[in-house]
Structures are given as structure tokens and as C-alpha cells.
Amino acid sequence: MSMVYINIFLAFAISFVGLLMYRSHLMSSLLCLEGMMLSLFVMLTITILSNHFTLASMIPIILLVFAACEAALGLSLLVMVSNTYGTDYVQNLNLLQC
């Protein structure tokens, strides 16, 4: 396994640990999710290009589209929560609270 793969895997792992540690604020969670998606995109692209999988060359673009949709939905949710409650705490997203 080359150093590039190790670095990208470490970026994914650090983003995942950040998602587990900083899950109280919505903005921190969204940034960690974007880091995870970016590292997955780079890893998938490098793997497909190095192995010459021509049939699977569309998969990283589809992953990037899903990441953009996730970012747009996350930011719209962040704006809605911050306008309603004044903070970006994830606990405000619980619909079972009164």
C-alpha cells in the first residue's frame, strides 16, 4: 500500500473521529462529513485510474454529485435551525422534544 493511500485513509479516519467527537454542533458535523466524502472521492478516483477500470470511471462523479446534494441539504438544514433556534446544536433537531 503506497503512502498516498495511507494519507487518504488517515484523512478519512481523522474526519470520522472528528465526526464522533464534535457532534454537538451541526456545522462541525457537516465539515467532518465533507472531509469524509472528499477523501472517499480521491481514494476512489485514484483506485479507478491506477487499475484502468474504464467502465467504473463514472462512479467518482456520481459520488461527487451525492456529496454536493448532501452539502446543500445540510446547509439548508443549518440555516433553518439557526434561524429558528439561534444556535446550531444538533440536539435542536430532535423532533420528540417539546
Curated annotation (Swiss-Prot):
It is a multi-pass membrane protein. GO terms for molecular function: NADH dehydrogenase (ubiquinone) activity. It catalyses: a ubiquinone + NADH + 5 H(+)(in) = a ubiquinol + NAD(+) + 4 H(+)(out). GO terms for biological process: ATP synthesis coupled electron transport. Its EC number is 7.1.1.2. The keyword tRNA-binding does not apply. InterPro entries: NADH_UbQ_OxRdtase_chain4L/K, NUOK/Mnh_C1-like. The chain crosses the membrane at residues 1-21, 29-49, 61-81. It comes from the Eukaryota. Belongs to the complex I subunit 4L family. Core subunit of the mitochondrial membrane respiratory chain NADH dehydrogenase (Complex I) which catalyzes electron transfer from NADH through the respiratory chain, using ubiquinone as an electron acceptor. Part of the enzyme membrane arm which is embedded in the lipid bilayer and involved in proton translocation. Core subunit of respiratory chain NADH dehydrogenase (Complex I) which is composed of 45 different subunits. This is NADH-ubiquinone oxidoreductase chain 4L. The lineage of its organism: Eukaryota, Metazoa, Chordata, Craniata, Vertebrata. The gene is MT-ND4L.
